Amino acid sequence: MLDVERRAAPEQVRDDWSGLARRALVPAGLNSPEFMIPQFRHMDGAELASVRESGALVLALPVKRRRFPSAFLANWVTPLNVSGLPHLDYNHGASALEAFLRREAAPVMLTGIPADGPFWDALQCAAHRLTIVDRWERAALRPNGSFETWYETNFERKRRKEYRRLRTRLSEQGRLECLSLKPGENVAPWISNLLDLEAAGWKGRRGTALKSRNSVTMAFTEACRDLHSAGKLRFWSLVLDGRTIATMFATVEGSGAWLGKITHDETLAKFSPGVLLILDATETFFSEAGITCVDSCAVPGHPMIDNIWRDRVAMADVVVASANVSQKKFDFTVRAENIRRNLRTTARHIFYKLIRRHRS
């Protein structure tokens, strides 16, 4: 018997959720309880959708009801996470998804989900209706062999020489160190350095830095603490004469890892500290046993990471539904979502055009 429910306070099921993550069909680190429960605590309007089989949790996904232009359910998109990949029990993937969809009298939107692999197969099996509203590929790293071999084969000699030159020039500015967060180390300074460095750059000036909203700052801080306590947080920093000039974090779950925020001192941009930090982090992923794929979580065609990590992961945004949802209602939701996305893209282009005109 499959029981479906939604709750606004998932703290009560933290242990069950953590257990589900350990036996998940595929790792879903961006929706881990350590990462998401602090966001529930400090941001409003979301619930945890869950499915149980004989009392055991077999599906967990943070969701939020959307009501315009039509009512439907979607994975919870926050300033920290846009992934709609749920935790699914390895032995109940398709059946749990089917029960979740059947519970809804409206379509369900899942954004930023893998467009191939076991979860995709289970979703196609469970959904009576499925439409892809967007599909893309983004950079990823699949560590295999040694970092040295990867580095030699991934970059031509000219590029390797340029990276050495950048690191040498940066080292000439002072004592350069690459540091990584150690198990049991106090994570608070790492969090503060990332928040402060990001706020000092263009995101701070635009008002989109994590530090621009107190609720986001608090959620991020608590999430990093919880992830670190669970052994699921990775952090790297480039430090020049004791001052952090670039920093980045990642979440890890099972065989997967996902890059989080990366930020750098913009006054040192000519030395490409972000690129150097990515290379240092890449080396550590090659030395970490069990990691088979690192998702960059970057936009497709990203000018930096796409030229460093050559592997790709296929992603998609989809609208799905059970047979309980009429074809008419489903089609209307898909059309409305496509219109909304087109309007958003147009508005963004106009905004950036006005910004460029204002600066010129």
Go through each PLM region and give its residues.
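A gly/proline- and charged-residue-enriched helix-loop-helix capping module
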Residues: 77-104
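Acyl/amide activation-and-transfer machinery of modular secondary-metabolite enzymes
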Residues: 76-85, 133-138, 175-177, 312-317
